[in-house]
Amino acid sequence: MQKEVVSGLLIPFLGTSLGAACVCFMKHDLSRGVQRALTGFAAGVMTAASIWSLIIPAMGMSERLGKLAFLPAVIGFWFGILFLLLLDSLIPHLHMNSEKAEGLPSKLARTTMMVLAVTLHNIPEGMAVGIVYAGVLTGSADMTAGGALALALGIAIQNFPEGAIISMPLHAEGKSKGKAFSGGVLSGAVEPLGALLTILSASRLLPVMPYLLSFAAGAMIYVVVEELIPEMSEGEHSNIGVILFSVGFTLMMILDVALG
């Protein structure tokens, strides 16, 4: 089981690293259409993971509350939304294809704020993987090793385009390929670290597991709505973003059911 957990924690990080490596062998920056497609795919995976891997299990763990089984999921979901809203307001960051930084005023370099933007929404993804594996380790009936692996694989799949989306623009901004690759990898490093810290607290987390699952879901949905959907929809020919969103959602749903 320990090997499965370690693998599960590293799989999403591997996805980011492989995506970031695209900068080493691709000669040209990603076109706007490709960026929209990849962003839509990532949004679809994150949305499906939030529902199938986090919110539904959270409600399943709260069945003892009867008709109020939705309550922990609702409370955790809103705390996740508000937590990301707070981070979004405080941490200086710059979204792709944006000229104006968000968060508190800062003298950070433009490229640093681009990395922080991706790192910001990798936090809930790392938490999600860690919480699910914590549930597996503590013997929760609603958490299975297969379901945890499905979530890790789903996030790894959507991390691949994310890694490319951050490393390629960093190179276009003037960074060397090595530094651009390092920036992409660094943006994903928060995921295994966050997941590991969550697992180390596993024994204390079981009573509040439904709240934590839905907390991670709320944080991920915030990222999808606030960042990914606008990026995949802006400009002309945004249909590709919608189509890839649907592909990502379907793939994550299949993974969760097939492996869970």
Predicted regions, residues:
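Intrinsically disordered, metal-sensing/regulatory segments
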Residues: 1-260
